Amino acid sequence: MTRPRLAQGLAFFLLGGTGLWVLWKFIKDWLLVSYIPYYLPCPEFFNMKLPFRKEKPLQPVTQLQYPQPKLLEHGPTELLTLTPWLAPIVSEGTFDPELLKSMYQPLNLTIGVTVFAVGKYTCFIQRFLESAEEFFMRGYQVHYYLFTHDPTAVPRVPLGPGRLLSIIPIQGYSRWEEISMRRMETINKHIAKRAHKEVDYLFCVDVDMVFRNPWGPETLGDLVAAIHPGYFAVPRRKFPYERRQVSSAFVADNEGDFYYGGALFGGRVARVYEFTRACHMAILADKANSIMAAWQEESHLNRHFIWHKPSKVLSPEYLWDERKPRPRSLKMIRFSSVKKNANWLRT
């Protein structure tokens, strides 16, 4: 009797295991998108596994002379240089450009830049590109992705060797808030369709800005944020976070590290893809509830960076406002806004 029962038990065990395996094969693909909210269009798109370009490790530094780091020597900057989560805060005096050049140039990296010029903002394209050609990632391969509703308005700007400009037509919108809200979605789709095969790092910047001094590989990192020039010296309770709890971008008074600017973010293309997807999903969640965050995508960007800390933070010298006098703590301005009539631009 024992042997038949043992055989019967073994048969039931094998049958149950086979059934579970078949059930798993049937539902595993469904599980990949089961967490996507019902209101999102094309949930499969947001779960794409992209074959990103292979990560390139830094090369050993050989036969290069540079000053010895001295822990006890007074630093050349008055700014904080390290966040509480051990991410570097980059500013003039915190890095050696020649040392970084020797480490990064052998990697043959391609750095992408997305910029949007819709409506009257096309008037800023020429100055932006000319300043980028003079100062942005000199000596590296650069691919500008210019999104515009009017490709005929893009001026011809001479580009250096290894530097490309792709003009990508997009729909125009009458309200500037709608343009801002659509940017995360557009960048995310562009990475999925194209940029993940073409660039190693991607920066997303505003077109009404100009480069004023060299911008190099010191800015490269997994996920990079820039401190907003208007709020780097004020307590976080005064940050213009979204304070309504009904919004996905809600931030409590006791939360937050820095207030980051929406005019600049970047990082490894895979991380930027994940970041823009998360922000776009949060924007859609608000839209489903008829809510628009206080500062649109910038509010969602700041909410995301509280939960998911940036691996590198850029000081306000990388995102300055020309209307403000430069404080003594900033030794240099690298990227700043241009003077403009905001009311005219938004009409």
Curated annotation (Swiss-Prot):
Substrate binds at residues 116-121, 206-208, 228-231. The active site is at 298 (nucleophile). Residues 1-6 are cytoplasmic. It catalyses: a globoside Gb4Cer (d18:1(4E)) + UDP-N-acetyl-alpha-D-galactosamine = a globoside Forssman (d18:1(4E)) + UDP + H(+); a globoside Gb4Cer + UDP-N-acetyl-alpha-D-galactosamine = a globoside IV3GalNAc-Gb4Cer + UDP + H(+). InterPro entries: Glyco_trans_6, Nucleotide-diphossugar_trans. It is a single-pass type II membrane protein. Residues 28-347 are lumenal. The keyword Membrane applies. Gene3D superfamilies: Spore Coat Polysaccharide Biosynthesis Protein SpsA, Chain A. Mn(2+) binds at residues 206, 208. Its EC number is 2.4.1.88. Pathway: Protein modification; protein glycosylation. The keyword Manganese applies. One of its GO terms (molecular function) is globoside alpha-N-acetylgalactosaminyltransferase activity. Its main location: Golgi. The conserved DXD motif is involved in cofactor binding. The manganese ion interacts with the beta-phosphate group of UDP and may also have a role in catalysis. This is Globoside alpha-1,3-N-acetylgalactosaminyltransferase 1.
